[in-house]
Amino acid sequence: MASTVSAYKEKMKELSLLSLICSCFHTQPHPNTIYQYGDMEVKQLDKRASGQSFEVILKSPSDLSPESPILSSPPKKKDLSLEELQRRLEAAEERRKTQEAQVLKQLAEKREHEREVLHKALEENNNFSRLAEEKLNYKMELSREIREAHLAALRERLREKELHAAEVRRNKEQREEISG
């Protein structure tokens, strides 16, 4: 106590009264303040206008003293009655069945969706094949008609040439008979 009083007396000599009052109300923390929380230490490193930086140091399990409470141990459970255990088991079984039913429902919906997609793809493929076949048949029919028309035109020209040749021969024979 005496050392504290003498320290204050020395401080009084060095500082003005206003500075002393301000220092009592606004104490500055130690620059490397260390805070301890259970099995970790938080050390303040830097304080800037943009923010603060800290260093978090975790103690290893061997460093934990026996006086500190073990945080990872589960809380003590009270003894449960047989009825309570049975009720919990039934509730867990019900949850398991509900979850299993939900999974089965989702799988059934997924399979149904896959079937619908496959059916739609097959239908579109069949429609495409049918349209392509119809288009090909139309083109083949059109080509056949054009070919037949062309052949008919060639036959007609050939018949006309033969008729003309026959007429020319007749005229020549008639001229020979007349002249000769």
Swiss-Prot record:
PANTHER family: STATHMIN (PTHR10104), STATHMIN-3 (PTHR10104:SF17)
Residue pairs linked by disulfide bridges in the UniProt entry: none
Record region (Disordered): 60-82
Residue stretches making up the SLD domain: 38-180
UniProt xrefs under Pfam families: Stathmin
Coiled coil location: 75-179
GO biological process: microtubule depolymerization; neuron projection development; regulation of microtubule polymerization or depolymerization
Residue ranges with Low complexity bias: 60-74
InterPro entries reported in the protein's UniProt record: Stathmin_CS, Stathmin_fam, Stathmin_sf
Sequence similarity: Belongs to the stathmin family.
Organism: Gallus gallus
Protein name: Stathmin-3
Keyword set, alphabetical order: Coiled coil
Lineage top rank: taxon: Eukaryota
Gene Ontology CC terms, in alphabetical order: cytoplasm; neuron projection
